[in-house]
Amino acid sequence: MRERARQSAHGSAIVNLASVAGLVGSQLDPLYSLTKGGVTLFTKSAALEFARKGYRIRVNSIHPGVIQTDMGDQTFVSRARNLATNDVDAVREMARKTHPIGRLGVPEDIAKGILYLASDDSAFMTGAGLVVDGGLTAQ
């Protein structure tokens, strides 16, 4: 990342994919929280370093909540096992209910956030984390 930053003459943006699990922790998957928390702090550190060195590169992160993807489905299966049930749909419904907005996220929700962070519309943002979680962490 540093080499690319040195080569950029006109400025650009880096968007790192983190997670709300890196902001609040997870009792069911602490290693996932550990790695996503690392991404969050790496983002802030890189943003500060690039700014200090005068690189015209903004570095931000995006923090999705629970998103309807293959990875999300695998998580529901794993959690169902941990709860000693085979009812994956019930686990998915429990996850949906934790989001005040009343639904799980879809990949397009995250894509729009990434587009914003990569665009000039966020030109005054660096070292920030955009939380796209349907209100999950607002509770």
Where are these regions (language model features)?
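Conserved SDR Rossmann-fold cofactor-binding beta-strand/turn motif
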Residues: 58-68, 118, 131-133
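Active-site helix of classical SDR
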Residues: 35, 43
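Active-site loop immediately N-terminal to the catalytic Tyr-X3-Lys motif
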Residues: 24-30, 102, 120
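A glycine/serine/threonine-rich, flexible loop-to-helix segment
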Residues: 66-98
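Alpha-helical segment proximal to the catalytic Tyr-Lys
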Residues: 48-52, 123
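Residue(s) in the substrate-gating loop at a strand-loop-helix junction
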Residues: 19
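Short, small/polar-rich loop/turn modules that mediate ligand/substrate recognition or access, typified
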Residues: 56-58, 125-127
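Conserved loop-to-helix N-cap of the C-terminal "lid" that shapes the substrate pocket in Rossmann-like
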Residues: 61, 88-92, 101-111, 135
